[in-house]
């Protein structure tokens, strides 16, 4: 893999992470608005619910990023195997 490809993948991954972070932030704001309307903002249960919701959102983000990276690794492995077999078939004597 060339250096440029690695840089582009890194920047793309960071961009996806920023989008996911923005989505989590937006969900958190909606959730906090709902909780502030239904629960007292300084109550113990408000803090507990907020912490659990944050953990679940970050867990979903982590699992999604792991899934995306595994799919990318599988695709790269399959491409490498195809390229290897293509090189071997081209170099074999006829």
Curated annotation (Swiss-Prot):
Residues making up the signal peptide according to the UniProt record: 1-22
Subcellular location: Virion membrane; Host cytoplasm
Intravirion side: 23-45
Virion surface side: 67-83
The entry's keywords: Glycoprotein, Host cytoplasm, Late protein, Membrane, Signal, Transmembrane, Transmembrane helix, Viral envelope protein, Virion
Start-end of Polar residues biased regions: 85-94
Bias type Basic and acidic residues, positions: 74-84
TM region positions: 46-66
GO cellular component assignments: host cell cytoplasm; membrane; viral envelope; virion membrane
Region (Disordered): 74-94
Similarity comment: family membership: Belongs to the oerthopoxvirus OPG135 family.
Role of this protein: Envelope protein. Required for an early step in virion morphogenesis.
Protein name, as recorded: Virion membrane protein OPG135
Native species: Vaccinia virus (strain Ankara) (VACV)
Lineage: Viruses, Varidnaviria, Bamfordvirae, Nucleocytoviricota, Pokkesviricetes
Gene expressing this chain: OPG135
């Amino acid at each position: 893999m060339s250096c440029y490809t690695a840089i582009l993948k890194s920047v793309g991954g960071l961009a996806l992470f920023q989008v996911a972070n923005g989505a989590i932030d937006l969900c958190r704001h909606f959730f906090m608005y709902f909780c502030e309307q239904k629960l007292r903002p300084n109550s113990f249960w408000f803090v507990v619910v907020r912490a659990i919701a944050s953990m679940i959102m970050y867990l979903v983000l982590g699992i999604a990023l792991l899934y995306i990276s595994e799919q990318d690794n599988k695709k790269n492995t399959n491409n490498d195997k195809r390229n290897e077999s293509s090189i071997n078939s081209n170099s074999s004597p006829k």
